[in-house]
Amino acid sequence: MPQIILNARNLGSGNKTALLAVPWLGMLTSLLGNLSLLSYFAKKKEKEAMVVQTLGVVSTYVVIVQLALAEAMPLSYFLATSVVVVSGLVLNFLNYFGLLNAGIWRFWEDFITVGGLSVLPQIMWSTFVPYIPNSILPGATAFLIAVVAVTMSRSGKLSEKGVKFVGGISGWTATLLFMWMPVSQMWTNFLNPENMKGLSAFSMLLAMLGNGLMLPRALLIRDFMWFTGSAWATFFYGYGNIACLYFLNVISKEFFLAATVGLISWIGLAFWRDSVVHGHSSPLASLRDLVFGS
């Protein structure tokens, strides 16, 4: 919300350049990642996680609308994104309440698998243009691989392990999309440090807090994918950008130290409480169970 308010103020004053501090490619990866994770949690009936992901989709989409108004995002990409977002929200909630045909849901799962696997390498490549040649080859190659994999899975031409692997692609792709946003933001910070004042410190704090609050639940149920995405966003998007703002003298030393102490304390508390719940003698045992299984 603070980033949305800051963007609205800059738009209202005609300062469209300030919105370039927020990379549209980074916002797009976050949006698609949140939408795909929403499908993942809707299927698992994780109500609280669904609410968090829905808020993430809606708030990120509002930022994308602002970037489109500032002409910081191509109109064609914005329109395509809008169609996918509206469709995704409707389908996910219809499925959660048992109002969606199973065939339509399977089509949506295949769509986000193919779409996510195609978009991820393309966005990763495009982030570094013009330092590397502009090309659609990464996305096109991934698209063909994804279509073949999904087709073989649905037609029964894969082993049970192969079907399970393809079924898990969308979840991990969503996590990687979500994880790429901090990379895109850090790259933008590196290229245009003078635009950092257009980045809201309170938005980064909320990103750190929001993702950090998901860590205990992901740790408790031993969901490594969920934990990985939340931890990455907590450290690299939320705290990482707070660190950038501090080193560029945009925020105070007290703000930075409070965020640092708070984050370390919360992570320590989460692992300590988890070790108590599971009867472990050390928090490291909880980490071992998370990564390698109990």
Model features per residue range: what roles?
Residues 1-294:
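Alpha-helical membrane-protein topology signature
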